[in-house]
Amino acid sequence: MHSIRRHPLLEFNSNGIYCAQADVYIDPWRKVDRALITHAHADHARYGMKHYLTTSGSALIMRERIGQSLSIETTKYGQKHTIGGVTFSFHPAGHVLGSAMIRVEHKGEVWVASGDYKIGHDSFGNHFEPIPCHTFITESTFGLPVFLSLIHI
């Protein structure tokens, strides 16, 4: 049996989705030292981070879109990175080339931050991979009540 966590593994603050234990952000919207990037679209990957960690597909796009001189470390899907005792891994999100959901594990607790994802298949080949977790942080383009009429489309 796991002990109850007093603080969330991931939390939102003025810079983005923050993992205090590892001192890293996922898709931060303000300048930070370490950023884990789910994919290269402008609302997720921004200029100004000291160091980025993302997939090689996202890194290619980020360098073209943001700048060749970015400090980017690339990772493969499923490869584990341990920072401050927290294990991070990137898993296919099916959204665009290089897109990933980020799995975060600490002391047996697993959280997943989705970024954008698509469960349908296409020619990119990085098809959505369901990840068992305790907490799932997701985005929703059409999640507001004003979009209820789209449910039957």
Predicted feature locations:
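His/Asp/Glu-rich metal-coordinating catalytic cores
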Residues: H2-E11, G16-C19, Y25-W29, R34, ...
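Conserved G/P- and acidic residue-centered "switch" motifs that form tight phosphate/ATP-binding loops
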Residues: H39
